[in-house]
Amino acid sequence: MFPLLHRNDADIDSGANALAFAALALGLNIVVGFAGLLDLGYAAFFAIGAYTYGVASSWQLQPEWTSFWEPFQWLDLVSRAQGTTGSGYVVHFQVSFWLMLPAAAAVAAFFGVLFGAPTLRLKGDYLAIVTLGFGEIVPIVARNMPTVTNGAMGLNGVAAPQLFGFNFGVNATPYYYVAVALVALLMAISQRLKISRVGRAWMAIRDDEIAAGAIGVDRVRYKLLAFAIGAAFAGATGTFYVAKLQTATPEMFMFPVSVMILVMVVFGGIGNVWGVVVGAVLLQILQSWFLEDLSQWLHALGRLVSVEWLQHVELASSIELIFGVILVVMMLYRRQGLIPASRPTVALSLEEQTAHIVRGGFDTLSGIAATYRQTSRPLLEVSGLTVRFGGLVALGSVDMTVLAGSVVAVIGPNGSGKTTLFNTITGLLAPDSGSIRFAGEGIARKGPHVVLERGIARTFQNIRLFPNLTVLENVLVGMHARLGTGPLGALLRLPRTRREEAQAHQRALEILALFGNRLLPRAGHLASSLSYANRRRTEIARALASQPKLLLLDEPTAGMNPAETLELAEQIGSLHRAGMTIVLIEHKLDVVVNLADKVIVLDHGEKIAEGPPALVRRDEAVIRAYLGRSAAFA
């Protein structure tokens, strides 16, 4: 509606520019806001999209006509034109703008995958430095390929879009409406991805990459997907931008542009779709409309108070400095941005806070229980497992067998190798030697997400929830490996996808109901707002959501008071009675005695005892390892 209310062509053009940067901010928001990958070279993909259309539509590039171009002429992508020197024919590229929007997005996504595949295993500052380098390389390549990009002079004569015979030319109004449509489309894509299985996987990686892998997310694949989709957004926007300007030069895509887009994302609200659009539009309006006027006011003030330097201030030329100041201020005083991505936690009513604890039934697990009742068949077999950290032997030839339907406790002093054992079983560490077989299949050296897919879920000694996701979303992430919706399904939202999501939400609520009104009333609360005990319960609920055949609990009652310990121990016992196979690390030996069918004792990375709790508690080696603390068994 803006062009109908305000017919100033320059202001409409500024509005189209603001929307173009909003589209770029939406793409970077997928990379930074959803997946948590710091990209300082995002303008490179903007350039790739721009040059893709520029090369395909500019009169400036006119290679000699040969038979090679004839198939493209049949497709109406090129035409044959008389050369300017009058000798021979040359190629005139005439690819449609509307065709190039998705094509440039695909080209940019391809380069995103090509660049990301070898680099996205890097993290933090290392990834930022590599992306910064890539962002600098692309303009350099454009400057040094004159036969394709016309070098430092840039491409001129880029064809304006046409629609139903109408040529956009330099009229700002049609570009504005195209920009509105483009931003609306990218917002819809962003929002649908965010609330889907794909978006939850990205946000899990952003919050805790290790926990995301352990709960079934293929981290490299999903980071690469985020990079590719973010690059596609930039590629499509680059095509629009160069079509509007009808020129493309390397200076349009330098490092300051990447920083400006990042500031827009931070300013609006990292991870919030509406927020980054608002942030981009506001900052572009500041740059286009207000800085020049503000400079004039400062000049007038300088003349009024006779201050010479105020009379020469040009704020527009200091836009990078201004954006840098905005970034610093936002990081210091409002990191969540103008429109935070996280929703405020709704306080529980007094009745909910003081209600008697009521738990759901464990019939939710009946499908698992029916399949994995206790048998004499080993579910997990660990043989000769050795893990070294330099000269330190963390695990030395450890053997362990876990029968289906049993509870096995692993105990030992601090530093005895218990958590290392769990980390190796679940793929977070690769053993130096030995084998791990689960349900008859070797799983040693497989990735954490593969181990989870096979049926082993775990909790961590130090709780690793996704703090910026709700309790319900944490449990839904736990179902990642058991759901099938990909990015295309998330975008189309077909009945099958909607049905799968509805069933997943229902299943998640049923799992939360296992912990009664400890968790169910808090389903919409951020995990970071929970008490310590409820964070423990939520982590177990998330592990159960993956429908595990084997559940590994690393010190589940650590940090809990006696009442909370008793309550959680009863719930673990209920899981066992429902047929769940459990291996737990536990220091509270009364919990071990009450729950475990078998106890394995580690000391300095070696197994020193194994057997029923009654037998192990009298073992002399165990008594020596615990320095008398075995009295806790009594």
Would you name each region that the model predicts?
Residues 411-413:
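The feature captures the beta-strand-to-loop junction immediately N-terminal to the Walker
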Residues 1-367:
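Transmembrane alpha-helices and adjacent helix-loop boundaries
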Residues 551-555:
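Catalytic Walker B motif of ABC-type/P-loop ATPase nucleotide-binding domains
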Residues 547:
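Conserved catalytic motifs of ABC-family nucleotide-binding domains
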Residues 426:
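Helix-to-loop junction immediately C-terminal to a conserved catalytic motif
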Residues 434-442, 454, 507, 513, ...:
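Conserved ABC transporter NBD signature motif
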